[in-house]
Structures are given as C-alpha cells and as structure tokens.
C-alpha cells in the first residue's frame, strides 16, 4: 500500500505497478450486481467505476465524455456477470435470484465491460453505445446483426445521417433528421463528421464495418446520401429520397393503405347521393336523408341502376316527356306504371315491392327488368331517342304494348310515369313522343333523294318520240318519263333524234307509208321517186353530174349546204312545207317523182320549199341566192308578194332542239299535195325512235339515188311525188352534204318558167357544181359561193 501511495503522484509508475500486480482474494470476488464493492485490493479494471463514484454518475450511469475526460473509461459495470455461487466469498449469497438478476442485467445491456481506460486521459477508443448482451438473439430488423439498407432498430424513425436509428431515440413526425457537421447530438462524436462516418446499417461502435453499396441497393427509399458520404454536408443526394422505407408499416403510404382498406371495409362514410333510405324506408321513395354513409340506398339494385341511368340521361338530354325524376302526374293507363298495377301504390305510395313495377308480372313495363330498362334508357338518351309512341320494353315498329320507344302507337313509357326510382321509372306516356320518323332520318332521306333525284310527279309527260307530251325528257308521273318507252331509252332516242333531226310524219315512220313517202322506200318505186329514180332525165352521177358515183364533190357539197342553211333561215315556206320533206311531193333532194331540181315535189323549185312559195319569197333572198336561182327575175316577172308563211324557220328550230313542233300550216298546198306537215308524232314510240335512228344514219352517210331520166318531167310539173324522204331536216341534209350526198337532180329544171316554185337551199348537184340541177346562168357561173 505504501508502494501504491508513493507511486500515485507518478502515473507511469502507477500504471507499471498495476500491470504487474496480481489480485489477492482475501475476501472473495467482486459481486454480481454493478456497484458492488470487491473484496481485497483494487482489481484491475475496477477503478473508480465499481464504487459508484468517480467515472459513475448518479444512478450508476456513465458520465458524458468531455474534452480531457474523467478518470475511468469503462462502462463501470464491473465484472459482475457471474453468479455469486461460482466463487465463494461473494458478498451477496448466490442462488437462483442472482442468476436471474445476472441474466436480466445482461439482457438490459449491462454485459461485459469494455477495455479499461487510463484515468485522466479522456475518452478512449472503447465502445460508447451499449450493445446487446449475451442473452439477446440477433435482431430481425435489417441493420442488427447483418448490415441492411436502413439502420437497425425497432422501427425506422428520425434519422441521423451516418448513424441510423438509435435505441431510445424518440421517433415520430416531430423529430427532424440531423446532418453531420452542422451541430446536433452527434456533432462531436469521432467518425461522424462531414466526411460521412459510419455507413447506414452499422450502429456506432459496431466491431464489423460492412461496405455500403452505392445507391442503397436500388431501393426507392434510402437515407438520401450519395455513396460513401459524397455530397455537400450530408445533404440528400441522388442515391434515393429520404423517407420511411416501404414495407415497414409506417409512414404516409402505410397510412393511406390502411385508410383505403378501412374505407373499403366500412364504406366511405360520405352522405349518399342516391335516394332510397329516407322516409318510412319504402324502397324507391325519395327520403329526407339520401343514403346512409355512402351506401346507396337500401332498396334493390334497380334503384342504383335507375339512378345512374337517370343521371346519364340528364347529362346527354333526357327523352322527351315528363321531367325525369319528378312525381308522376302524367297520363297513364291501367296496367301501365303510374296509374294501375303498377302505378298508384307502387313504390312510394303503397306496397313496397320492386320500385316502379308494382306487383311483379301483373303490369307492363314489358318483360324488361328495371336494370335493363334503365340501361336502355341511358343509351337511348346518349345517342338520341327515336320518336314514336310505345308502351315500354325493347323498340318495336308496330302497335302494341311493351317495348322501348317504338315507332308504333302505344301507351306506356320506360318503365312508368314518375321519376327514377320513384313511382314509375323514367317518365313518359308514349316513350319518346312522336309518331313519324325522326328529323335525322327525314333529313337523311331527303339528302339521299336530292342526291339521286327524288321520284315525284312529272311536270309534263314529255315528248319522247312516240309518247305524248310537250317537253321532251321531263319525267312523267312517278318519275317514269313518257308512257310506254323507258325513260333512259326514250331520252337517248330523243337526244339522238334532236341531233340528227326528227322524222316527222304520220305513218309507222315519218311520212305516210311504211317509210317516208307511201311506197316501200322514198317514193313508190325502187328508189326515190316513182319511176326508176328521181327526176326523169339523166340523173346526176350517171353520166354528167356527180352524186351517184363517187358521192359528189365534197367541197362543193359543203358550200351548197351552207348556202342552203342561210336561205332556209331567211325564207318563208309556202303551204305544205314545214320541216323540209314533209309535204306530199316535197322532200330532201331527189325524192319526188317529178323532174326539176332534185327533191322537189309537184312542180319545180329550189329544194326545200313547197309549191306555195311565191315571188315575194324569192325576192326576200340574198342577191347571191337570186343570182343562181333559175326562177329569179330572169325567168319570172315581178309579181305581187303573197303572205309569207313561216315553215322552214320553224323547221330549223325544231331540228335544233329535236322537239316535234306541230305544223304551222297543215292542209293543202297550192301544188304541193296533201302532206301532214310538221311535228305530228308517229304512231309508236319504238318505231319513231327506230325511224329517227335510221334517218340519222342515212343522213350521216348520204343517200344513194338511182339513175333516172333528167329533163322536163311532165310539162315542167312532173307527176306529183308521193312522199319524199320525209323527216330529214336541214341538219340532216347538212350532214349528208358533209359526207357527200348523192345528187339526184336532172339536167335542167322544168320547161319554161318554174310554176310557182319555191326558192330554198340547193343540196345535190346537177350540171354545175355551183347551182345543182341547173345550167350555168349569169355571173355566178363557175364561181364558188360560201
């Protein structure tokens, strides 16, 4: 003892002596309970900690480390972990109580003490945080025993970067995380500075340092630190976001999940929107308090479905009728919801059965369940209801009960009169009101009819060849043009006839006989005329004049056709004229029986005029026409002008538009015979069309006349022709002249003067290419006129 007292002022000597001293056991071993006084001399490591003073504070707790430290760095628990019965001489009797106390102390964290420190040297590198004792099993939470993503502890709480959750540190929303290096509870602990310190998952002082994986193992919730402590002062980096880890049962996510689970189990708790619970509890009757805690009514599911359908119908527009959901006051019929069974006494007023249906099976709304009816009503309201009057059920197009709004006549509605889910369901008396087709359908039909042409009553029957009427081509009654001829064929025939000229006449084809004229073909004989061929003398094309052989000189024919057209527009026809070739004895060149210029009827004359033309007509022509006219003033004296009768002009107009114009002057010509001039429609539509087509084709390729005897005819007058190739108007004549019509003129006109011959166009050729059928007279001889 003297040695120890003398060595006390010298710490080095004291340390040396303490290291070589051996414990003596005069009175036993230190007690099992911390704070017990050991027997004998000082035991190494006991220091001041075993006496409850020195390094121990009040209650046996170690003092907080400060710069300079206090003497004694151990935990101060002593070596009291062994039961007293082990070594005799213990102050406290050994036994079961001591063993239990030792186990409890070990479990509480007393455990074995740390390595003893040297007094007066401050805090050593010994453990600071109490560790689990020998009786504690490895922790189940990651971070205790095995390094994990987040620190150990019972539950994650407020974090201390680099330290983790410490035992005994309160957790909750009021604790804020502390960043190292900026102060706080762990600002002065070695290894917990701004450089990062121990990594998450390793409590302070743990003997094993596990490396930290960058990014927190890729989990969404970490401490928010960059790997290995990188980052400004421990501020949360890109490795993750700070917060409670998932799957631990705490934090806002867990709270939200728990709330959702509770809401799903017990209901949302909000006030119900759908009616059905208030009042006396009758299903379907609107109550004072709609719904109970979010439970939509207590009635049948039909109420909810009907309410949803009503909401949808209100959104897109309710079907016309009573106000949806209003009290049913609209008309109802017995058996239809709202008046009979079901109706009065159905949900809300009497027997609380199915809403809007009354006694099941005894009423109409058809066979459809309320759910289906409500769904159908919503769909109809969404896409637009079809107007009609029905009784209920699925759409029908007839008359009867049951049916979603139909097009027939019915009574009921969808299913009832009142509201949803009131007394009658979706209100209405006739479904969606209306009897006819919807405006949309009518508009679509009108548009289609306008696009393709609506069938309606024709204005006029039309003058399709062979069919009575006035305006050609206008559809008749019901859109069928004419009477007998199909519209398409008749219109086509009319157009073609108008192009080439109609063949007016009276017989089967224009004229009187089978074809123009009376005979088989033009005239009566083999070909135009009655005898051998037109005229009497040598006909053009046989020997002298062109026409029968090569078809004439094309250029001359064209010029003659133009002159004929001009003359025709300025001339006025005599009696029996009309469209060229219609009167008896008048026709297209070379068709009459008599002689003269080709195609003249009784008497001579320039083609195209009947016998009634006079000097006044001739004098109305242009000088160029009078110069080549054999019946001009060189042969006839001036005579008073007789009234001009428009014939050819109307014929030209008729030929242009193809319409059969009634003859201006029918009846007898002076010498022209008895024709039925102008526009008398043929006997049959098909024959008229065929004749028009044949005439047009004949005019297109030119008529071939046969040779005849030119010359005088009978006294200059000739035998009256029996027809003429009627129906080929000037347009057809011009067409024939274009392709070269066979000239059928004689050598000269009649003998002497032309008796009352008309003056008109000059188709065909005689001796002279300038004036067909006549000699070269005057200064026009040899000249070509346009």
UniProtKB/Swiss-Prot annotation:
Q: Which residues carry this modification: Hydroxyproline?
A: 34, 65, 67, 88, 156, 167, 170, 177, 290, 352, 355, 421, 465, 522, 550, 646, 769, 772
Query: Which GO biological process categories is it annotated with?
Result: animal organ morphogenesis; aortic valve morphogenesis; blood circulation; extracellular matrix assembly; outflow tract morphogenesis; regulation of actin filament polymerization; regulation of smooth muscle cell proliferation; respiratory gaseous exchange by respiratory system
Where are the disulfide bridges?
776-781
Q: Which GO cellular component terms are attached?
A: collagen-containing extracellular matrix; elastic fiber; extracellular matrix; extracellular region
- Region annotation (Disordered) maps to 615-645
Keyword Ribosomal protein (UniProt): no
Expression by tissue: Expressed within the outer myometrial smooth muscle and throughout the arteriolar tree of uterus (at protein level). Also expressed in the large arteries, lung and skin.
Report the locations given in the UniProt record.
Answer: Secreted, Extracellular space, Extracellular matrix
Q: Which UniProt keywords apply?
A: Disulfide bond, Extracellular matrix, Hydroxylation, Repeat, Secreted, Signal, Williams-Beuren syndrome
Q: Which family does it belong to?
A: Belongs to the elastin family.
Q: Report the function annotation for this chain.
A: Major structural protein of tissues such as aorta and nuchal ligament, which must expand rapidly and recover completely. Molecular determinant of the late arterial morphogenesis, stabilizing arterial structure by regulating proliferation and organization of vascular smooth muscle.
Query: By what name is this protein known?
Result: Elastin
Record gene name: ELN
